[in-house]
Design a protein with these regions (language model features):
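Bacterial N-terminal signal peptides
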Residues: 19-29
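Solvent-exposed, non-transmembrane regions of membrane-associated and secreted proteins
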Residues: 36-239
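Membrane-interface motif at the C-terminal end of an N-terminal transmembrane signal
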Residues: 29-37
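Alpha-helical hydrophobic membrane-insertion segments
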Residues: 14-17
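N-terminal secretory signal peptides that target proteins for export/translocation
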Residues: 1-10
């Protein structure tokens, strides 16, 4: 990918927009972890050898209506923690977990955040066509298929108000990027982490988007009973 040169611009922000940008752009700041939905035996959460059923059995109870774990066969199995009230930029610094992005939930999207030095490193291993599952404490499992992987460069990596460049060198604000990624709703799943480059931990952003799949796909996965490696299957998306 080729990116054009960057120039600094200054734009006015309303207080609401500033809050959104701070929540979206500052999530990579390391903060103290919260304790929620850990694995009972504290085994490595990213261990790809776990089956979905084994992973679900090890999860602790999550808040009502919240996902307790993220699972991608042969790739990752991560418990999910929640952001503390009033901390929209919080991302856990606990190894082997991912954090649900509360602001994204308001727009019908399940957003999961992780530092690229921790569980976010597992996100970079994912590929389009793979299936992901969200596990809930009540036994419910929601299945998704990864449909897009997008990368953006921060024009000012150390600024909370940085603009971003997409792969075509189009420049957009953090608020515009948030809208593009999270405000489409439709029960999408989005995984977000930072991209490190040239010694800068927050040089860019990685977004992995997954769409809900039909009951037909869920049935096929159940029949496979773990024998099928869930990669690059051509299945219809839910409507």
């Amino acid at each position: 990918m080729k990116y054009k040169g960057l120039t600094k611009t200054t734009k006015p922000f309303s207080s609401a927009a500033a809050l959104l940008v701070l929540a979206f752009a500052l999530f990579f700041s390391i903060v103290s972890p919260v304790s929620a939905a850990p694995l009972h035996d504290e085994s490595p959460a990213g261990m790809p050898g776990l089956t979905l059923q084994e992973f679900a059995a090890q999860l602790s109870t999550a808040p009502q209506g919240k996902p307790a774990g993220l699972y991608v066969a042969n790739t990752l199995a991560l418990p999910i923690v929640q952001q503390p009230a009033g901390q929209p930029g919080f991302v856990s610094s606990q190894a082997g977990v991912t954090t649900q992005f509360g602001m994204a939930e308001k727009y019908g999207t399940t957003g999961l955040l992780a530092h690229n030095t921790l569980a976010g490193a597992e996100f970079s291993k994912l590929e389009t066509g793979q299936f992901a599952a969200l596990v809930y404490s009540n036994g419910e499992t929601r299945h998704y298929r990864i449909t897009a992987i997008d990368r953006y460069i921060a024009s000012e990596p150390r600024s909370a108000y940085s603009d971003f460049l997409d792969s075509d060198s189009n420049r957009i604000t953090a608020a515009e990027l948030f809208k593009r990624v999270y405000q489409n709703g439709d029960d999408r799943l989005v995984l977000q982490t930072c991209i490190a480059n040239d010694g800068i931990a927050s040089w860019g952003r990685l977004f992995i988007t997954a769409e809900p799949v039909t009951e037909l796909v869920v049935a096929a996965l159940s029949q496979a009973a773990g024998a099928v490696q869930m990669t690059s299957l051509s299945m219809p998306l839910a409507k």
